[in-house]
């Protein structure tokens, strides 16, 4: 697994129109966030901070059991760090999902289940607010929000916490704990 370094740095690539993370040794990671959702500081060069490294390690630990390849796990963890640090505040889009029970407060890095009439998706909590959380799709397959709108791997969305169910790991598979 890729280990964070104090030589890593964030920068915005105008040509690619994307936030990038320079990993050194001629390796660059392209963040999966649209420029229109980035806060102003995302367009300035800055170091990969101690907080970024701590968040990266936390996300890596929480996704270790997911049925993803190592490169995909790194991609997911780095996109989580970027969204946590550089994503503009957003309003919840809870109407896409069914209520699964009140009183659930997920922790950052936790894997949760979100359901609707079209299926069930698995998401990682990027940031937890009082009643809602920004989460990111961890499934490789697209998740249908409605018949015409789909989410892709590593795409973020903010959802009310009552739409989420905690996940339980059984032999590297995950299941929702409801009730």
Curated annotation (Swiss-Prot):
Its main location: cytoplasm. The keyword Cytoplasm applies. GO terms for biological process: division septum assembly; FtsZ-dependent cytokinesis. InterPro entries: ZapC, ZapC_C, ZapC_N. It is found in: Cytoplasm. Pfam families: ZapC_C, ZapC_N. Keywords: Cell cycle, Cell division, Cytoplasm, Septation. Contributes to the efficiency of the cell division process by stabilizing the polymeric form of the cell division protein FtsZ. Acts by promoting interactions between FtsZ protofilaments and suppressing the GTPase activity of FtsZ. Interacts directly with FtsZ. Belongs to the ZapC family. This is Cell division protein ZapC. It comes from Aliivibrio salmonicida (strain LFI1238) (Vibrio salmonicida (strain LFI1238)).
């Amino acid at each position: 697994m890729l280990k964070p370094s104090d030589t890593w740095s964030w920068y915005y690539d105008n040509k690619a129109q994307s936030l990038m993370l320079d990993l050194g040794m001629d390796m660059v990671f392209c963040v999966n966030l649209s420029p229109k959702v980035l806060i102003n500081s995302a367009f300035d060069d800055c170091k990969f901070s101690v907080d970024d490294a701590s968040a990266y390690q936390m996300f890596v630990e929480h996704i270790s059991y997911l049925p993803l390849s190592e490169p995909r796990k790194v991609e997911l963890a780095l996109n989580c760090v970027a969204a946590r640090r550089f994503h503009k505040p957003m309003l919840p889009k809870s109407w896409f999902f069914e209520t699964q029970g009140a009183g659930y407060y997920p922790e950052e890095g936790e894997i949760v289940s979100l359901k609707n009439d079209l299926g069930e998706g698995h998401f990682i909590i990027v940031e937890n607010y009082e009643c809602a959380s920004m989460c990111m799709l961890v499934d490789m397959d697209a998740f249908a929000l409605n018949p015409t709108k789909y989410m892709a791997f590593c795409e973020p969305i903010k959802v009310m916490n009552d739409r989420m169910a905690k996940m339980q790991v059984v032999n590297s598979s995950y299941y929702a704990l409801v009730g």
